[in-house]
Amino acid sequence: MFANIGWWEMLVLVMVGLVVLGPERLPGAIRWAASALRQARDYLSGVTSQLREDIGPEFDDLRGHLGELQKLRGMTPRAALTKHLLDGDDSLFTGDFDRPTPKKPDAAGSAGPDATEQIGAGPIPFDSDAT
């Protein structure tokens, strides 16, 4: 909850508390805030343990599914589209169409002949009418 508060922010909060509450009421306010946070943390840990007891072994499955949703939540729409629909090939978005795609073996287990094997080791064919 307060993970993003640094030392400078904490110092500013204490100074504002000194101005607003005064030096005689500030220690009591700090004690009250600390006890309220401690009670809230204890309540939330109790709810988690109660839920774990009520649901049983399915609780771990539920946490796994929630973890997967959390991973998807952090993705941008472009990353989700690239990962799930395009199998990680983002050349559609980057315009890098000349990049070789990784070859997947076919059902027989061989990747098939390369384009260099089909052309041969001779000179590169040139068509003067094509240019």
From Swiss-Prot:
For this UniProt entry, which segments traverse the membrane?
2-22
Q: Does this entry carry the keyword Nucleus?
A: no
Instruction: Name the predominant localization.
Output: membrane
Compartments, as annotated in UniProt: Cell membrane
Q: What did gene disruption experiments reveal?
A: Essential for growth.
Q: Does the keyword Transmembrane apply?
A: yes
Q: Which GO terms describe its cellular component?
A: TAT protein transport complex
Q: Which UniProt key words apply to this protein?
A: Cell membrane, Membrane, Protein transport, Translocation, Transmembrane, Transmembrane helix, Transport
Stated role: Part of the twin-arginine translocation (Tat) system that transports large folded proteins containing a characteristic twin-arginine motif in their signal peptide across membranes. Together with TatC, TatB is part of a receptor directly interacting with Tat signal peptides. TatB may form an oligomeric binding site that transiently accommodates folded Tat precursor proteins before their translocation.
Entry-linked HAMAP family:
TatB
What name is this protein filed under?
Sec-independent protein translocase protein TatB
Q: Which organism is it from?
A: Mycobacterium tuberculosis (strain ATCC 25618 / H37Rv)
